[in-house]
Amino acid sequence: MPTTFQEIPRERPVTPLLDRADTPAGLRRLAEADLETLADELRQDLLYTVGQTGGHFGAGLGVIELTIALHYVFDTPDDRLVWDVGHQAYPHKILTGRRDRMLSLRQKDGIAAFPRRSESEYDTFGVGHSSTSISAALGMAIAARLQNDPRKSIAVIGDGALTAGMAFEALNHAQEVDANMLVILNDNDMSISRNVGGLSNYLAKILSSRTYASMREGSKKVLSRLPGAWEIARRTEEYAKGMLVPGTLFEELGWNYIGPIDGHDLPTLIATLRNMRDLKGPQFLHVVTKKGKGFAPAEVDPIGYHAITKLEPADKPVAPKKPSGPKYSAVFGQWLCDMAAADNRLVGITPAMKEGSDLVDFSERYPERYFDVAIAEQHAVTFAAGMACEGAKPVVAIYSTFLQRAYDQLIHDVAVQDLDVLFAIDRAGLVGEDGPTHAGAYDLSYLRCIPGMLVMTPSDENELRKMLSTGHHYKGPAAVRYPRGTGPNAPISGDLEPLEIGKGVVRRQGGKVALLVFGVQLTEALQVAEQIDATVVDMRFVKPLDEALVLEMAAGHELLVTIEENAIMGGAGAAVGEFLAREGVVKPLLHLGLPDIYVEHAKPAQMLAECGLDAAGIEASVKARMAKLGL
């Protein structure tokens, strides 16, 4: 196995067993004794594939053995296998007939980064966000019961995803309806238990066996006739198991808990899964794995190797790096530290995105004011609301796509009470290879309809810093949405002064057309304006809208064009149109933004071009409308 990133193979490794087992039917024809070798081959093939394409890395390496065991024991796709989030599903894709397409992973018109129902019958449920698998598998299990179908439903969920309330809602419901399903906890952070070894594996085999289950049920029937005897026996059993396994919580929720077992021990996995396959009711298997298993750098640094970029060809000349600005998330991280130094009321909150949202420095400099609430977006928002009630100034750093999960809390717990909570909304707009489940396509639409909400869209790095300060000083809920990646390298001022609320800026004065830009498409709009002699306005604020400036532009131009990287329906452009309609102003309007589709995964530049939001697309759309109007 390679020991460094550069040693990842650039040519497909020789894999004679995997060549025969790239479908579950082929896998089941292998002897059980061959599966260890198959796991080695699959791990090498995964390293090769992701090395060529880039993508999620560590989680897949950690579930090689579990994936093999699941498809070996269960009759997939008839038995329903649901992966939570989907970061770990690359080995599943390789083993379910898509190996020959893996080099198109996360590329335009290629296979998706996550399980997709439209891609394969083995992808029983589309995922991307966390903590949905148990609910989905439970729904499938109950549907199977209603159809008198004996198929099994299996959910595979990580220990991080299990922190979300939705997962526990499903666990609680499953025992109430006595669902015939299996939940597998993929514990790859060892945050729940380190109790793994020969004794634990042996105990798991015993507790999951049909003999044990039948003896347990028989004893229950006998002892239930004796007053108090069954309760004593039950507590004795729980005490004995509790000394060896940490399953009390799940047992109390009504699940038959087995484990923890070593998730890289194929014989134990297969024996345990075979036993549990035949058990009725809600079954819970705790499997401990190592993220990045088999690739030393990923084992040492599972966060850094959660995902990787693709390998460059060995003979590719090193091109000089083009100067670029800092990432927008880095600008936010620096502002957070600066404002924290100036205002000791500031606290930073994130739902498990410390690295992605660039809160690492803040967490180290202000540990007592930093709160990672885990994958719990609803809790994050109401937690912030509670702190705001007591005079704190919470900043919730959250991805646009994940804020959708806390919309009720945003309205009910923050906005209705007019609390001072600032939402730093990262990954707004199109995010690229992760596709539609991760796109921040709707935040302007769902934020601007909330009374009292301040909504801002920076056009560059300096504007982001100023808007964050504006939101921090605002009395009430505020949101700043900014994209993934770097900006145009605008000079950044070091001050913390706010902007004048609700005021846009004319960046270029032109002729008959005015381009009203909400966000980072300002750079492209300025390029287009040079070709068609247009006025360009950096609108800055979606709410409150600079109504005076909109009226001025309408009076002085023959066509208004709104530009935003958000859904056209209900977005910033719609706000302009609604305002003009209220004022009785009739003016030709062209709205450019994200169409009413789910934009499929591709490179960000390809996605913008597909939506007509690159410079060429904007210019073509404006010229077409100008021609139609005779301008």
Swiss-Prot record:
InterPro entries: Dxylulose-5-P_synthase, THDP-binding, Transketo_C/PFOR_II, Transketolase-like_Pyr-bd, Transketolase_BS, Transketolase_C. Thiamine diphosphate binds at residues 87, 128-130, 160-161, 188, 295, 377. Its cofactor is Mg(2+); thiamine diphosphate. Pathway: Metabolic intermediate biosynthesis; 1-deoxy-D-xylulose 5-phosphate biosynthesis; 1-deoxy-D-xylulose 5-phosphate from D-glyceraldehyde 3-phosphate and pyruvate: step 1/1. GO terms for molecular function: 1-deoxy-D-xylulose-5-phosphate synthase activity; magnesium ion binding; thiamine pyrophosphate binding. This is 1-deoxy-D-xylulose-5-phosphate synthase. It comes from Pseudomonas entomophila (strain L48). It is an enzyme of class 2 (transferase). HAMAP family: DXP_synth. Mg(2+) binds at residues 159, 188.
